[in-house]
Design a protein with these regions (language model features):
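Envelope-exposed proteins and targeting segments
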Residues: 39-42, 80, 149
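Extracytoplasmic "Venus flytrap"
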Residues: 37, 44-65, 87-93, 115-116, ...
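Flexible, small-residue-rich helix->loop connector segments that border functional cores
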Residues: 65-77, 168
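Short, low-complexity disordered leader/linker segments with a strong preference
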Residues: 1-42, 73
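An alpha-beta-alpha
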Residues: 150-192
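Acidic/polar active-site rim loop that often engages polyanionic ligands
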Residues: 143-149
Length: 192
């Protein structure tokens, strides 16, 4: 059930991206790349499909593909069919930036990704420089959407930590709590 909810969330967010992109498709959507055939709209995705975090990237990749298939079957966006390409970044920042450049060279007009926080924080610098629309479905680090071209579908790390603390306090589950976290991990230190 949780996997279906996540896929549904990705599909809804993808539909939002496509709708927003269709509204602004007449302007320049990137300094280099961003142009495509007049009868298509190119959406890129980045996330890990191999490595330790592959379960997250694979779920995002498949969810986006479901949304693309559904939207294209319904006639596309204002008559434009969506072309979709997903790149594996193995949850690595350098590979994620390389994946972004590959998609930009392909002619990507909007990016869904990256899936994990550290690569997303690296890629958002590139999308900001290129004025490329970016939507991350799951990168929760505060810095992963620090510019006005980048958006997040989920809550941020500090929100998760605060919500957990509030829940514990409001439900009187504990009066003292010890926190053990990995200060070298973006997610752990973000929640703390």
């Amino acid at each position: 059930m949780k996997m279906w909810k996540k896929a549904a969330s990705v599909m809804l967010a993808s539909a939002m991206v496509f709708s927003l992109a269709a509204c602004g498709s007449s302007g320049d959507s990137g300094k280099s790349g961003g142009s495509s055939d007049s009868d298509t709209f190119k959406i890129g995705g980045i996330g890990p499909t191999t490595g330790d975090a592959a379960i997250y990237g694979t779920a995002v990749k498949n969810g986006i593909q479901l949304a693309v298939d559904e939207i294209n079957a319904a006639g596309g966006i204002n008559g434009k069919q969506i072309e979709y390409k997903f790149e594996d970044d193995q949850a690595d920042s350098e590979k994620s930036v390389n994946a972004y450049n590959t998609l930009k060279d392909w002619g990507m007009q909007a990016l869904i990704g990256t899936t994990t926080s550290t690569p997303c924080t690296a890629v958002v610098e590139e999308t900001h420089s290129d004025n490329m629309f970016q939507l991350t479905p799951s990168a929760t680090a505060v810095d992963s959407i620090q510019y006005d071209n980048a958006f997040r579908m989920c809550f941020s790390d500090p929100n998760q930590g605060s919500a957990s603390a509030d829940y514990i306090a409001e439900n009187k589950l504990a009066t003292k709590v010890a926190i053990i976290y990995n200060s070298s991990d973006t997610y752990s230190s973000g929640i703390y």
